[in-house]
């Protein structure tokens, strides 16, 4: 009878609740299934076929289907050969009863008691992408820099005072059984840091147990808490927190204190108002969570033989308390809604009065649009008319000026004609002579105009040549300046330079100062200095402009200088190659020395670390002894100053300690009684369950025996029984 029948067993590993979603998809335990006899068993007494109770109707809103949770099985699949009719509805597939395999539960209507927990339709918009506090995020590249001024003494004193006040407020010394001195946050010992870190982390995660050394425990915990600067903390620093590293660990303790305060505030609903300001109402979620947690706790504590009515009676107070909490939560919204409805009615009435007292808005809008269109058209027409008027005014002014000029010219022509007529009359010239003279004058005027036109063309060409010559002269001056600069750089200028060898290489433009290449002939006088020529028939030569013969002596000097520089360059290259070989040898020697220096530096660092550790231990011991001596001296002085006052204080402390001890004794007795009661209840449940299992096994054995007798006969049954006994 050691076969696994698929029933629930106390030897199976305890099933976890798995992930609980926001709508509380908490699974229902197997103990909630109602076990009652069914008529399916026929003539068999105590039939093993279990009928499941119908689904209990919930008072809350419908909940989505329960998730598929896994449970492990430790039995075999021997019963699957033909005894499926005597089993209750299995929560696992028949093909996976091997040890260590996880099977999924199939939650169906009727195989378990329906949960009273149903989903509520939240009125708050869904917030996606919730991120767990301990979820791992990609770490940024490099070691992040702490922006806090941890090296500042005033900042250290302030955060140290905050940490000390927080520990005193939450009974650090009583919980950790460790006394802290006043200077513990200025020069702490390794033991002080260990106690403070463990206590602060227990404020964040009370169920954590420290089992390793502190230098091995802290790094993974910092990664789990997602401390932003955990990469800047090494194990060697954790093993020696004093000295220069204390500011870093003081910032770590302050950050953990703030994190613990934030978690306490979250538990104490301190951020509900901030959620309300952000438009998220969490009061309903808290009511639902309290209902689910309290109701589920009582539901698990119920006896599995209770009926649906008794279960509903047990859960009814929780439903009523949830309804009352929702009524209290919704009362302010109801009053606000009433106020808003009254305000809405008042505003609607005002709108109706305004609509009655004012014309139709549609007609007004239509008229307004027409007037806007007319306004735009009038503005455009006005702008066009203004432009035309300005144009006509300017044109009329110009025409008036031209008319005045024409009138003046006409008057002058009339006067000239009258004067000429008088002169002609006085000379006695006939009209034929006047016509002939006029024709000759016109011919000469045309000749003068053609000559003037040719002269203008010649002057234009000459001015272009002058501009080109001036540009060429500017370019020549720039090239001479660039030549002189480069010659000075390569030591050719002055004549006393290294490469000049007493010769003159400096170029100069020797054009006469009184020559003006930019003066146009059209505007120049008869002087030859304003021409681009030396005289009326000769222009400037290259030798007249530059002081040196570039194509002769200067070119030969440059060729010889280039050859000499090439020889010196070849010699310098040979010397440089030799120097490079020597430098490579020196570098190899330096690398060897550098390796030796690094080895010595490593030994020095190891010695310095050992020295620092020894110094820290010695300093800590010295500080502890100094603090103890100072404390003893202060106590001695206080005892000498006022012995009677100390006696009264000690008596009062003794009275307080006695009262506290009595209270602790009473609390311990009450807790002991509560634990004894709980243990008795659990033992009773275990005994009842054991009796139930034994009874079920006996019934099952009898049922199997009857089945085998029917199918195989009494002889075969006896042989099978002997085989089973063997």
Curated annotation (Swiss-Prot):
Keyword Coiled coil in record: yes
Keywords tagged on the record: Cell cycle, Cell division, Centromere, Chromosome, Coiled coil, Kinetochore, Mitosis, Nucleus
A UniProt-annotated Pfam family: Ndc80_HEC
Chain segments annotated as coiled-coil in the UniProt record: 323-489, 587-682
GO biological process: cell division; mitotic sister chromatid biorientation
GO cellular component, one term: Ndc80 complex
Region annotated Disordered, chain positions: 1-76, 90-148
Molecular-function GO term, any one: microtubule binding
Annotated localization: Nucleus; Chromosome, Centromere, Kinetochore
Family in the record: Belongs to the NDC80/HEC1 family.
Quaternary structure and interacting proteins, as annotated: Component of the NDC80 complex, which consists of NDC80, NUF2, SPC24 and SPC25.
Protein name: Probable kinetochore protein NDC80
Organism of origin: Gibberella zeae (strain ATCC MYA-4620 / CBS 123657 / FGSC 9075 / NRRL 31084 / PH-1)
């Amino acid at each position: 009878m050691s076969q696994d029948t698929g029933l629930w067993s106390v030897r199976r590993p305890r099933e976890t609740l798995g992930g609980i979603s926001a709508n509380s998809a908490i699974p229902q335990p197997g103990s909630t299934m109602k076990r009652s006899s069914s008529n399916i068993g026929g003539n068999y007494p105590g039939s093993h076929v279990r009928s499941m109770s119908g689904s209990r109707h919930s008072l809350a809103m419908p909940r989505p289907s329960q998730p598929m949770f896994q449970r492990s099985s430790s039995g075999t699949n021997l019963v699957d050969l033909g005894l499926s009719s005597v089993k209750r509805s299995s929560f696992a597939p028949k093909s996976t009863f091997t040890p260590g395999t996880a099977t999924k539960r199939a939650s169906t209507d009727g195989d378990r008691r329906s949960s009273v927990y149903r989903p509520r339709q939240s009125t708050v918009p869904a917030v996606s992408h919730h991120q767990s506090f301990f979820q791992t995020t990609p770490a940024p590249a490099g070691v992040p820099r702490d922006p806090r001024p941890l090296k500042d003494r005033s900042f250290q004193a302030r955060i140290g005072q905050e940490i000390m006040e927080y520990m005193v407020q939450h009974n650090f010394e009583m919980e950790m059984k460790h006394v802290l001195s006043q200077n513990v946050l200025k020069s702490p010992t390794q033991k002080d840091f260990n106690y403070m870190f463990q206590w602060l982390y227990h404020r964040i995660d009370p169920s954590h147990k420290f089992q390793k050394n502190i230098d091995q425990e802290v790094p993974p915990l910092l990664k789990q808490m997602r401390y932003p600067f955990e990469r800047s903390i090494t194990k060697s620093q954790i093993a020696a927190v004093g000295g220069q590293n204390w500011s870093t660990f003081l910032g770590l303790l302050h950050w953990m204190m703030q994190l613990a305060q934030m978690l306490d505030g979250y538990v104490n609903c301190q951020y509900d108002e901030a959620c309300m300001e952000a438009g998220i109402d969490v009061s309903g979620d808290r009511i639902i969570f309290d209902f689910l947690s309290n109701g589920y706790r009582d539901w698990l504590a119920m006896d599995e033989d209770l009926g649906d009515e008794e279960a509903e009676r047990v859960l009814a107070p929780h439903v009523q308390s949830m309804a009352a909490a929702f009524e209290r939560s919704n009362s302010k919204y109801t009053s606000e809604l009433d106020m808003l409805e009254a305000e809405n009615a008042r505003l609607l009435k005002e709108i109706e009065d305004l609509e009655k007292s004012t014309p139709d808005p549609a007609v007004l809008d239509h008229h307004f649009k027409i007037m806007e269109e007319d306004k735009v058209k009038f503005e455009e027409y006005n702008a066009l008319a203004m432009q035309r008027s300005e144009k006509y005014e300017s044109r009329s002014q110009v025409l008036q000026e031209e008319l005045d000029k024409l009138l003046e010219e006409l008057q002058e022509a009339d006067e000239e004609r009258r004067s000429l007529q008088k002169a002609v009359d006085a000379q006695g010239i006939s009209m034929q002579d006047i016509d002939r003279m006029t024709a000759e004058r016109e011919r000469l005027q045309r000749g003068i105009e053609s000559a003037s036109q040719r002269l203008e063309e010649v002057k234009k060409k000459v001015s272009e040549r002058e501009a080109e010559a001036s540009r060429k002269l500017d370019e020549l001056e720039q090239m001479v300046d660039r030549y002189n600069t480069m010659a000075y750089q390569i030591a050719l200028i002055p004549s006393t330079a290294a490469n000049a060898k007493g010769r003159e290489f400096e170029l100069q433009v020797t054009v006469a100062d009184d020559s003006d290449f930019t003066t146009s002939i059209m505007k120049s006088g008869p002087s030859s200095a304003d021409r681009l020529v030396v005289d009326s028939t000769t222009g400037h030569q290259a030798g007249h402009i530059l002081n040196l013969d570039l194509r002769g002596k200067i070119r030969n000097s440059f060729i010889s200088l280039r050859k000499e520089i090439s020889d010196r360059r070849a010699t310098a290259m040979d010397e440089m190659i030799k120097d490079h070989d020597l430098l490579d040898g020196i570098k190899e020697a330096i690398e060897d020395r550098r390796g030796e220096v690094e080895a010595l530096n490593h030994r020095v660092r190891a010695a310095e670390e050992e020295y620092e550790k020894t110094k820290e231990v010695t300093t800590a011991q010295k500080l502890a002894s100094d603090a103890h001596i100072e404390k003893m001296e202060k106590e001695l002085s206080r005892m000498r100053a006022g012995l009677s006052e100390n006696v009264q204080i000690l008596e009062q402390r003794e009275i307080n300690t006695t009262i506290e001890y009595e209270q602790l004794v009473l609390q311990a007795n009450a807790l002991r009684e509560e634990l004894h009661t709980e243990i008795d209840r659990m033992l009773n449940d275990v005994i009842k369950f054991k009796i139930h299992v034994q009874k079920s096994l006996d019934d099952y054995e009898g049922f199997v025996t009857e089945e085998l007798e029917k199918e195989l006969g009494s002889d075969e049954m006896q042989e099978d029984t002997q085989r089973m006994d063997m």
